[in-house]
Structure formats: C-alpha cells, structure tokens
UniProtKB/Swiss-Prot annotation:
Region (RNP-binding): 165-252
Organism: Influenza A virus (strain A/Japan/305/1957 H2N2)
Record gene name: M
Subunit and interaction comment: Homodimer and homomultimer. Interacts with NEP. Binds ribonucleocapsid by both interacting with genomic RNA and NP protein. May interact with HA and NA. Cannot bind NP without genomic RNA.
A GO term from the CC aspect: membrane
Motif Nuclear localization signal mapped to chain: 101-105
InterPro entries: Flu_matrix_M1, Flu_matrix_M1_C, Flu_matrix_M1_N, Flu_matrix_M1_N_sub1, Flu_matrix_M1_N_sub2, INFV_M1
Function as written in the Swiss-Prot or TrEMBL entry: Plays critical roles in virus replication, from virus entry and uncoating to assembly and budding of the virus particle. M1 binding to ribonucleocapsids (RNPs) in nucleus seems to inhibit viral transcription. Interaction of viral NEP with M1-RNP is thought to promote nuclear export of the complex, which is targeted to the virion assembly site at the apical plasma membrane in polarized epithelial cells. Interactions with NA and HA may bring M1, a non-raft-associated protein, into lipid rafts. Forms a continuous shell on the inner side of the lipid bilayer in virion, where it binds the RNP.
GO molecular function: RNA binding; structural constituent of virion
SUPFAM superfamilies associated with the record: Influenza virus matrix protein M1
Localization per record: Virion membrane; Host nucleus
HAMAP family: INFV_M1
Record's keyword annotation contains Repeat: no
The protein's name in its UniProt record: Matrix protein 1
Length: 252
C-alpha cells in the first residue's frame, strides 16, 4: 500500500458515511494526484461542510496544507488552528511538545506513527497544531505518520461506541437502528438505480421500505417488528445488484 493510499484510508475512516464522504474521498484523490492545486478554495470548501466535527475538519485541513503546494506567506486558517489546539488543555500541549521533539528525530512514516500511537488524541492534535502553525518542522512523511496515528485513535473510540450500540440489549435502540439502516439502504438503492431497466423495480422496493419505516415511526410498533425489515431490504438490494452485475463488496 502506498503512503498516500494509507493516509487516505486512515483519514476517511473518521468521516461519517454519506454523500459528503464520497465527496471528500474525491477531493483527497485529486489532491494526492496533483489535480487540485488551489489550497485557498479547498480550505474554504472544507470550512463550510456540514456534519464534520471541528477536529475532522482540522485534520483534513492539515492534510490538504501538507499536500497542496502553496506560497510561503499563505495565511493559516483559524478553523484549523482552533481544532488543533488540544481543547486548550495545557497537559495536551506539554505532551505535544515532548512528542514533537521525538518526531523531529524521526524520518519515516511508520516510525513516526509508532511513536505517536503512544499518545492521546488530544496530544496528537496539539502536535499537529504546532506543525501547522509553523512552530515546528518535520518531514511530510513524519507529519503523515502523525495524522494516521491520530485517525487510528479516533476510529478506535468510534468503533468501541459503535460496537456498544450494535450489541446493546435495549430493544428500542436496536429497533431504531434497524429502521435507520433500512432507510439508508433504501437511499443506496435509489442512487444505484439510475436509468437502468430494473430501475423502476429498485425504486419501488426502496419506496415501499421508506413508507414502511415512516408508518412504523408514526404509529409506533413493537421493537421486534423491525427485525426482518433491514434483512429483506438488503436481500432485495443484493438480488438487484446481481442482475445489474454490480459487486457487493461496497455494501457489506
């Protein structure tokens, strides 16, 4: 796996799924391929994106700044600086300075990532802030190692939280989660349908599922009543995709 592929993988792991994630993935690919060289426009676009947390925006802004060639005097962006200040916690800043001293002696991506993984996400973000504000300089490879370690820490905590939700025994949360997943699967079917011959069938199935979810939410149902809803919808989606010759990997 190339360095930039690895960076893209880690960064996208902390972006919530949805159309915005696809858009960000495209922007990252363009930046890494040298196709997008307007850092100012890129940062303005990033700043106004909804849904993303300030920290995720800060990390993306840091990656764009590292990758896109720009004039030396280009102004640093406040939204990135605020996100990478470690919540203003002096402990984070102390640890960030210690980490920075170690990273300065490092030259490889993997070496930097290994060192950085021993620190908290707050300290890692603060260290990124030091580099972003030009208070410290490391090689691009080392900076990318720091980015990936930060994303790994964040993704780990997101995964723990997600696992808690998936394994929860609370029937109301499970029921709502199944209905949300059914709705997003329906949306995926509608997006994939496009103008194909089977489009009408896919749209019909998706539309029925949405109506069912809306009805269940409006009248209230027993928490076990949604158990088969998502599975039925996924089965229909798989059958539809097989006929269309589309690979299932992306939807597993």
């Amino acid at each position: 796996m190339s360095l930039l592929t690895e960076v893209e993988t880690y960064v996208l792991s902390i972006v919530p799924s949805g159309p915005l994630k696809a858009e960000i993935a495209q922007r990252l690919e363009d930046v890494f391929a040298g196709k997008n060289t307007d850092l100012e426009a890129l940062m303005e676009w990033l700043k106004t994106r909804p849904i993303l947390s300030p920290l995720t925006k800060g990390i993306l802004g840091f990656v764009f700044t590292l990758t896109v060639p720009s004039e030396r005097g280009l102004q640093r962006r406040r939204f990135v600086q605020n996100a990478l200040n470690g919540n203003g916690d002096p402990n984070n800043m102390d640890r960030a300075v210690k980490l920075y001293r170690k990273l300065k002696r490092e030259i490889t991506f993997h070496g930097a990532k290994e060192i950085a993984l021993g620190y908290s996400a707050g300290a890692l973000a603060s260290c990124m802030g030091l580099i972003y504000n030009r208070m410290g300089a490391v090689t691009t490879e080392v900076a990318f190692g720091l980015v990936c370690a930060t994303c790994e820490q964040i993704a780990d905590s997101q995964h723990r939280s997600h696992r808690q939700m998936v394994t929860t025994t609370n029937p109301l949360i499970r029921h709502e989660n199944r209905m949300v997943l059914a709705s997003t699967t329906a949306k995926a079917m509608e997006q994939m349908a496009g103008s194909s011959e089977q489009a009408a069938e896919a749209m019909e199935v998706a539309s029925q599922a949405r109506q069912m979810v809306q009805a269940m939410r409006a009248i209230g149902t027993h928490p076990s009543s949604s158990a088969g809803l998502k599975d039925d919808l996924l089965e229909n989606l798989q059958a539809y995709q097989k006929r269309m010759g589309v690979q299932m990997q992306r939807f597993k």
